[in-house]
UniProtKB/Swiss-Prot annotation:
This is Alpha-acetolactate decarboxylase. It catalyses: (2S)-2-acetolactate + H(+) = (R)-acetoin + CO2. Pfam families: AAL_decarboxy. Gene3D superfamilies: Hypothetical protein, similar to alpha- acetolactate decarboxylase, domain 2. Keywords: Acetoin biosynthesis, Decarboxylase, Lyase. One of its GO terms (biological process) is acetoin biosynthetic process. The gene is budA. InterPro entries: Acetolactate_a_deCO2ase.
Length: 260
């Protein structure tokens, strides 16, 4: 059986049971977001949400830090900062974020796939299987990675450049033959500019020493857990940079370049 057929079967089973969207009766299960990806694209790199505050909304997710100081990964209630050296550091609760997405991870769908699969194949398999592309999916993948390519972003100085310029000189790292976890989301197309439409995924190795924003990979022995919700809540900063930013422009091309 192909992996997309296994995903389809897994989603269908939980649809029939009636627990796909509300695991264990959690009617208020939601994805929480601080600020927008559009603001980040415009160089709004300072927010007013602390990681201590963010942790009250979720134990699983991704984002960044004020001054765009690296990539963030939240896994099992622990927050990690991937700095420009590619290494993972613990995040103090006083640190602040200009953009982050979290949820209280409570998956209903699990798929185990032993065979090799790459990033494009994985996206295609999930896209074919999801019962709707108009809701929100939090995705955790624990696997052996034969190869993975990630990036991070270096701390910026004011005046902040747009994110697309930062991404053109981002540090990239390639690793092989290691175990780790993918932490990510699939957002609907209609959310482009609020978030990244489609997939946005970060990586943390099993030893919790390195990671980054995922650009490509080949993995095997994958255990895929998916949390589905129809609820999304966002808070935007009350600081001047966000309030004064021009967020009316169409940023599809810039988002695609910066995130891929």
């Amino acid at each position: 059986m192909a992996i997309d057929d296994i995903f389809i079967q897994a989603f269908r089973t939980h649809q029939q049971k009636g627990d796909l969207f509300h695991p264990l009766g959690h009617e208020d299960h939601e994805v929480f977001q601080s600020s927008t990806i559009g603001a980040l694209m415009e160089g709004v790199y300072d927010g007013d949400t602390t990681y201590g505050e963010l942790a009250r909304h979720g134990d699983f997710g991704l984002g960044t830090f004020n001054a765009l100081d690296g990539e963030m990964i939240a896994l099992g209630g622990r927050f990690f900062q991937i700095k420009s050296d590619g290494k993972a550091y613990p995040v103090p609760p006083t640190a602040k974020t200009p953009f982050a997405v979290v949820t209280l991870f409570d998956p209903t769908v699990q798929v185990v796939w032993p065979d090799p699969i790459d990033w494009k194949q994985f996206q295609a398999a999930v896209d074919k299987a999801v019962p709707s592309k108009n809701v929100f999916y939090a995705i955790r993948v624990r696997a052996c990675f034969d190869h993975i390519r990630v990036r991070t972003v270096p701390r910026q100085r004011k005046p902040y450049p747009p994110l697309v310029e930062v991404a053109r000189r981002q540090p990239e790292f390639e690793y092989g033959h290691l175990e780790g976890t993918l932490v990510g989301f699939r957002f609907p197309d209609y959310t482009q500019g609020v978030n990244v439409a489609g997939y946005h995924v970060h990586f943390l190795d099993k030893a919790e020493t390195l990671g980054g924003h995922v650009l490509d990979f080949s993995m095997r022995n994958a255990v895929v857990d998916i949390d589905v919700t129809s609820q999304f809540r966002m808070e935007v900063p009350e600081c001047g940079a966000f309030l004064d930013a021009d967020l009316a422009r169409n940023q599809d091309e810039a988002i695609h370049e910066a995130e891929n």
